[in-house]
Amino acid sequence: MLKLFSAFRKDKIWDFDGGIHPPEMKTQSNGTPLRQVPLAPRFVIPLKQHIGAEGELCVSVGDRVLRGQALTRGRGRMLPVHAPTSGTVIAIAPHSTAHPSALAELSVIIDADGEDRWIEREGWSDYRAHSREALIERIHQYGVAGLGGAGFPTGVKLQGGGDKITTLIINAAECEPYITADDRLMQDCAAQIVEGIRILAHILQPREVLIGIEDNKPQAISMLRAVLADAHDISLRVIPTKYPSGGAKQLTQILTGKQVPHGGRSSDIGVLMQNVGTAYAVKRAVVDGEPITERVVTLTGEAVSRPGNVWARLGTPVRHLLNDAGFCPSADQMVIMGGPLMGFTLPWLDVPVVKITNCLLAPSVTEMGAPQEEKSCIRCSACADACPADLLPQQLYWFSKGQQHDKATAHHIADCIECGACAWVCPSNIPLVQYFRQEKAEINAIRLEEKRAAEAKARFEARQARLEREKAARLARHKSAAVQPAAKDQDAIAAALARVKEKQAQATQPVVIQAGSLPDNSAVIAAREARKAQARAKQAAHPMADSAIPGDDPRKAAVEAAIARAKARKQEQQAGSEPAEPVDPRKAAVEAAIARAKARKQEQQAGSEPAEPVDPRKAAVEAAIARAKARKQEKQAGSEPAEPVDPRKAAVEAAIDRAKARKQEQQAGSEPVDPRKAAVEAAIARAKARKQEQQAGSEPVEPADPRKAAVAAAIARVQAKKAAQQQVVNED
């Protein structure tokens, strides 16, 4: 009885919420054995056929490659890809790949040579002799990834499991309609699958190993039981057929009764799951030394005349496989990669087969049915009842349609496995899975942008911290360099400061003169006497001819005679019109001073200028000026009462006459006598004389003022002295 209860507990299974039972449509392809497909003339191998970054290229255009040769290097999650056959690399360029939008990805294009030669293979038949790390590295470098549809690198998955794994589950459910790749593989290669399971169990060392398979695969179940007849470490669990029981979280719950938490992974509860196709690839990589270069693909649908499962080389164009299966396309023919619920329609047939390709479905028009028009949601909750992940698809639909990313995330849209059960039962024909895929892609893009922004912020903060550290270090160096100078340096600095202060004190010391004493002006007097002696020496250096008293000058004699006559006439007129006045001593003194000044000036001019010959032109001009002045004086004397002689005016007129005479002498000495110029100058002189006569007749004459006469005399003396000094400077 105890053994019966133990056996019951051992084979116990659980159930999950939701799920559907669509038509299976598996009998079209699971009845024929696996077969090989002829090599395609050209292969397109995308560098990224897994979850993660693409590997680093290790081949170039023109290289000859063999089957199994690595085309890229794999580090971390970068999984390498290998050549599916021998041939020549003709291009490395972007090419459309297995994607709903047929996005272009970098690919290696190889022209097959038809020889299909392998690289040298080295298998580990005794894999137990190798360490766990060596086995994981070999699995990774041989390009093994999850072949159930996710494409996660198997080596990374095994490495991440570590010692936490207590249960290893082999997924053999294959629940989606039409797909029979795993079913046929278990029928034909059960022993190799079990050997691969043993390798995985050797790496992980779990407490139990479970194989979950649906009850709609009787031939596969019988083959596995035959292989596992003597095995006590591996349990085969047959579960009811229900879609999507092949999901990782759903199968985990069925076999263990444990639920994976929201946002978590199966490894969080000590469970690791692998596909039967992955177990077979592990066996070939470890034991046979063959990288993954091919996989089983189901070719099915009413548009295919020879449905079945084939060994398809990775990189083979879809068109080549369908043509080998007898593809008969209709006018509006569609081809689906994957199953009818979780697959996607290919935009064209030139895309290559990759590691996650498990089925190519080519249905007829009647098989798929007429397309249904999308209607509004009626809130019937049928989608929520069918959801195996316990989500609310109708709420996620509204959040996705309204771009409410935060609410969609809060309602666990990331836990959606995109099984399509909600869309299958929707009476409004709403393609819910398409909305959910788009929403998850947008959320991932937002998170990626936030991650980049956070990384940029971290780099900026690190840079600011580095700059602050450098600044602090720089200030510390400056402070350490600013030490006190040595004692001898301080002595030198103090001496220099003392000298500067002494000089400043001497410069600012005031001059003190004692009371009752006279200042010492001997230096100033000596300087003045030196200047006088220098001036006398310069005068003595002139030729004796310059200092000789010139003889009589007819020109000056004529001018003086004219002035004398004019003064005589003016005095006669004043004497005849006015009574005699007593002699004024002040006027006499002024006139005497004026006469002395004129005499000194004439002597200086005579001593500084050489005697020149008489110029008839200048003589005529001077005579005309003298006559004009005489007429002016006569008119003033005849029209106005006689006035006393004004010394100021006389001095000014005499100075003007002397200036004109000097100017005319200079001009006469530099130019030859020209009769025309002489006539012009005489005319100008007569015009000036007439103008002066007119002005004299129109302006009144003011009586003479003794004070003004004295001032005028003083001004005349100053002007005479200034003229004499200027003459000396000019001569020097």
UniProtKB/Swiss-Prot annotation:
Membrane topology (UniProt): Peripheral membrane protein
UniProt cofactor(s): [4Fe-4S] cluster
- State where it is primarily located: membrane
In the Enzyme Commission scheme, what number(s) does this protein have? 7.-.-.-
The UniProt record lists the keyword Protease? no
What subunit structure does UniProt give?
The complex is composed of six subunits: RsxA, RsxB, RsxC, RsxD, RsxE and RsxG.
Q: Which family does it belong to?
A: Belongs to the 4Fe4S bacterial-type ferredoxin family. RnfC subfamily.
Tell me what this protein is called. Ion-translocating oxidoreductase complex subunit C
Gene that this sequence comes from: rsxC
